[in-house]
Design a protein with these regions (language model features):
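Glycine/proline-enriched, intrinsically flexible loops and inter-domain linkers
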Residues: 1-49, 54-79, 83-351
Length: 351
């Protein structure tokens, strides 16, 4: 991807996340956790060999992505006509249309102001590019050349991952491939069960933090979370979080995405040698009230969700650090990072 993408966001910043999942959609290897499960919950069409699905709309895929500039490519992996796995990747596009360049307007009050919305759609049908669909999408962004090359890079990466899955199946057989995936998921489950027992107490811990301002003079916005353990299961309850914002700082947080945050956070601190995947998700229960900053009602604006995302890591770090400050990173910082966009025209007409 880094060699074939064109935009600096993907090529230099690396704002893209690959994954390979089993046929049920659980990520076995990857970086960001699986967004296939939330997608499958909302997708009603058939899935056939050669199909490649594109989406960017949080409201149409149960927040498998959380704002419109993140374009998701999903490839079902088939071998001899049988669905055996998934490969998927999302990348942040430099522009998605909407009212400002970069497509993250702080003054947006609805998602309709933030650019083109792509429901889960077959970009390829049985291996054939739907070129009219692609041109329609690119006609609505300010950086069509960058987006085209970046999208092609995501598709090529997913196809390469799918090819490697098929090669493994041919070499070792389906049973070995499936059992290996199950073992990798189970190892992660066992590791996280131990970590949860070590660092999450049965008595509730509570922490809250704030987004001071949304850039439109409104705020602060409270993010509150209560954490405790029931048996082997960790519970995170965001009751008490403020209602959704009128501006774009809302973060439509899928429950599985928060599980990924929790897992990657703790694994990287406690034992970075553990392979991170979705195997532990049954050990975590996440509760997010509807209509809040973290689960806004449609059509709330979402483009500026990065600030709330960072603050969630601050809250999570504080909760975990209460009981183990020597082990857990508990210093805030990411949510205070500035996000600046610069654009303009060069000497070429219209560029």
């Amino acid at each position: 991807v880094f060699r074939t993408a064109m935009s600096p966001g993907i090529r230099e910043q690396g704002d893209c996340f690959p994954m390979i999942a089993n046929k049920e959609g659980k990520m076995v290897v990857g970086q960001f956790g699986s967004f296939i499960g939330p997608f499958l919950e909302a997708y009603n069409d058939t899935i056939e060999e050669g199909d490649i699905i594109l989406t960017n709309d949080p409201y149409m895929c149960n927040a498998a992505v959380s704002h419109l500039p993140d374009w998701v490519v999903l490839v079902p992996v088939f071998k001899d006509g049988r669905h055996i796995a998934w490969s998927a990747m999302f990348g942040h596009m430099s522009d998605n249309g909407g009212m400002v360049p970069g497509s993250i307007p702080i003054e947006a009050t609805t998602i309709f102001q933030e650019g083109i919305r792509i429901p889960p759609t077959k970009l390829y049908k049985k291996g054939v590019l739907q070129s009219d669909l692609l041109e329609l999408i690119l006609h609505n962004v300010r950086t069509p050349q960058w987006n085209r090359f970046d999208l092609n890079a995501l598709v090529a990466a997913c196809n390469t991952a799918a090819k490697r899955c098929v090669e493994l199946s041919v070499r070792f057989g389906d049973d070995v491939l499936f059992s290996t995936m199950d073992i990798m998921l189970r190892r992660n489950y066992d590791a996280m069960k131990h970590i949860i027992g070590m660092f999450i107490p049965e008595e509730p811990r509570v922490f809250e933090d704030y987004l001071c301002d949304d850039g439109m003079g409104m705020g602060p916005y409270k993010i509150k979370c209560t954490m405790w353990r029931e048996g082997e299961k960790a519970i995170f309850d965001f009751s008490g979080t403020d209602p959704q914002a009128q501006s774009s700082v809302n973060f439509f947080l899928n429950e599985d995405m928060f599980k990924m945050f929790f897992g990657s956070f703790t694994i990287n601190v406690v034992d970075p040698q553990i392979v991170f995947n979705d195997g532990f998700y049954d050990l975590v229960d996440v509760r997010i009230p509807q209509g809040t900053l973290l689960k806004p009602n449609y059509p709330a604006a979402l483009s500026g969700r990065t600030h709330a995302l960072g603050r969630i890591f601050d809250v999570l770090g504080a909760l975990l650090g209460m009981g183990a400050p020597e082990m857990m990173l508990n210093a805030a910082g990411f949510s205070d990072s500035p996000h600046l966009f610069f654009s303009g025209y060069d000497s070429r007409p219209g560029k």
